[in-house]
Design a protein with these regions (language model features):
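A conserved acidic beta->alpha catalytic loop
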Residues: 21, 36-45, 87
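Catalytic core of nucleotide-sugar-dependent glycosyltransferases
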Residues: 184-190, 197-227, 231-270
Length: 334
């Protein structure tokens, strides 16, 4: 059996499409755990309507406590051999669960990654050498890992980044990881999403980045991971905090805070990372590692790599000089 977890909060407009895509799966042995996180619209009524028609649907009705608390409740109530999540405003193809299940069985995987989730190529997020972090709905997890390790839960009072922390920690316990590139997850980006709002609020993001580092610092220390897994922590810093540093419209003070936080944690990380492993980092991130101050970092970026970041028509824009011409990037995408 596979457990499917759907966290629901005020999504009456999208919920039916989500539920229809899950109950219509070609793989039928499902338990569908719907956590109603204190919705104030008709979401609960829709869940109850569907639960009457399909006995596989279980509703957990609770006061609003946030994404992490809701997903943790779902984990505690899951009875399947595997677990995956679908956001309540998204939907999946009919063969989604079947493909992931067959992949896990074929490869004896503890963890299967939906490699083309939301048009993101996640292939370089997890390798034999290191891992960084993944979005919640790109993960297909063997439940025994979560049942045997009660410490592996979503961190409370962290958003955005709660899924990054959770996935990073769970992957430490996964012996076999595989990718599935045929399973299609349809991500619906909409106004009012809690995570999107948190990401847009740069000042909030600064506080969250500090929490990310504190949580993982403690996790690495408790599990004696510094000597063996520091490269993974460095990749987490690069793909989560450094990406935000490069693309978000921080104030000058907040930008300096994020820089200093990254430098402080990297001092602890990089003493356990070999120079040979720098091949896994971007040139810009190596500049950060080798810079002592934010002024020095931007000097290196500007003159060594001809990279300038600024605001242009109220959008985050980068300009890079390459092959005698300038390229304009929005959020580092052409």
């Amino acid at each position: 059996m596979i457990s499917v977890m759907i966290l629901v909060y005020n999504v009456e407009k999208y919920l039916r499409d989500c539920l229809n895509s899950v109950i219509g799966q070609t793989y039928k042995d499902l338990e569908i755990i719907c956590i109603n996180d204190g919705s104030t619209d008709n979401s609960l009524s829709i869940l109850e309507e569907y639960a009457k028609k399909d006995s596989r649907i279980r509703i957990i009705n609770k006061k609003n406590a946030g994404v992490s608390a809701g997903r943790n409740d779902g984990i505690e109530n899951a009875n399947g051999e595997y677990l995956f999540c679908v956001d309540s405003d998204d939907y999946i193809d009919r063969d989604y669960a079947q493909l992931l299940y067959e992949n896990a069985k074929k490869n004896n995987s503890d963890f299967v990654i939906v490699s083309n989730f939301n048009s993101w190529n996640l292939d370089k997020r997890v390798t034999k050498k290191y891992h960084s972090a993944l979005p919640t709905c790109s993960m297909f997890i063997k439940m025994s890992i979560l049942k045997e390790n009660k410490n592996l839960r979503y961190p409370l009072n962290v958003q955005p980044g709660e899924d990054a922390i959770f996935s990073h920690e769970v992957l430490m316990y996964a012996k076999n990881v595989s990718y599935e590139d045929k399973a299609n997850y349809h991500y619906i980006k909409r106004e009012g999403q809690v995570t999107q709002n948190a990401i847009k609020n740069a000042s909030t993001l600064v506080k969250q980045i500090e929490k990310w580092f504190d949580i993982l610092d403690e996790f690495y220390t408790k599990n004696n991971l510094w000597q063996t897994k520091s490269l993974s922590f460095a990749k987490f810093v690069e793909q989560e905090a450094f990406l935000a540093f490069r693309t978000k419209n921080f104030t000058q003070d907040d930008e300096r805070k994020v820089f200093d936080m990254m430098k402080n944690i990297l001092k602890k990380i990089m003493i356990n990372v070999n120079k040979d492993d720098y091949q896994y980092f971007s040139k810009e991130f190596i500049c950060l590692i080798e810079s002592n101050t934010i002024k020095e970092y931007y000097s290196i970026i500007k003159y060594k790599y001809n990279y300038i970041r600024f605001r242009f028509f109220k959008q985050n824009v980068s300009i890079r000089y390459k092959e005698n011409r300038y390229k304009l990037y929005k959020n580092d995408n052409i």
